[in-house]
């Protein structure tokens, strides 16, 4: 009977964590030092974007990784949903934005909002190292963060960055037709942390891309990262499950994420 009651309490807490948002100041404490995995979704997506992917990542893993979903609102305040296991050394934080629109101007705003979020997380958990994942424009937000904000954080190190279908040259199909954002990324590549390891996942769903992002736009990441960081490599996923929106929960992608980040 006691076990059943405890189960009901856990179930209730899980449901409440999923349904109820809390002020960021109410984030629970951790009993251990953490090295979080922090994820950023792409444009139009919310902090719930990676729910299915995280369920797949946790499948067969013991213990499961905590999932905390943070939303940064346009007025600067932040809320969160989810539950932190207090002895989880590698919890997953997803940071989404009220302003989740596309375009370089918005990407720069989102990078500033992410910088505010990671400042709050470090004040709460005092970590000096983290691993990162960005889907689509999430990878672009991370690139802006690395070049413009990371050095402002004392002793903070991004150990690994995994990007999925990130369009470093936006919607262009020819690498010779470079957008201003890509030019800025290349100009500022010396600001990238030299110890960083980067894995870029590219989807081939139809001809030369994942149905949304052209192959050459993802491969433009070479111009930014290759030779400037500790390691840069690319992985190609092809087939009917390699569409841009399907890539984060693609089984091959899940294997690559586990291998690289966990």
Name the predicted role of every residue range.
Residues 7-133, 140-262:
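Lipid deacylating catalytic domains
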């Amino acid at each position: 009977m006691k076990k059943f009651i405890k189960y009901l309490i856990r179930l209730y807490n899980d449901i409440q964590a999923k349904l109820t948002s809390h002020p960021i100041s109410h984030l629970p404490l951790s009993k251990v030092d953490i090295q979080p995995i922090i994820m950023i979704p792409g444009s139009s997506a919310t902090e719930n974007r990676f729910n299915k992917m995280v369920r797949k990542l946790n499948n067969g893993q013991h213990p499961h990784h905590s999932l905390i979903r943070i939303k940064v609102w346009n007025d600067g305040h932040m809320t969160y949903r989810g539950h932190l296991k207090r002895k989880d050394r590698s919890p997953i934080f997803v940071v989404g934005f009220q302003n989740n629109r596309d375009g370089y101007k918005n990407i720069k705003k989102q990078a500033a909002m992410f910088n505010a979020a990671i400042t709050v997380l470090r004040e709460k958990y005092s970590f000096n190292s983290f691993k990162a994942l960005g889907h689509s424009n999430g990878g672009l937000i991370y690139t802006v963060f690395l070049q413009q904000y990371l050095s402002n954080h004392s002793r903070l190190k991004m150990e690994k960055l995994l990007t999925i279908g990130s369009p470093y040259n936006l919607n262009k199909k020819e690498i010779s037709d470079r957008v201003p954002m890509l030019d800025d990324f290349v100009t500022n590549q010396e600001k990238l942390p030299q110890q960083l390891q980067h894995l870029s996942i590219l989807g081939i769903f139809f001809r030369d891309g994942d149905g949304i992002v052209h192959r050459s736009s993802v491969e433009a990441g070479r111009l930014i990262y290759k030779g400037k960081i500790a390691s840069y490599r690319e992985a190609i996923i092809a087939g009917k499950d390699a569409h841009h929106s399907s890539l984060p929960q693609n089984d091959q992608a899940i294997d690559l994420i586990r291998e690289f980040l966990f």
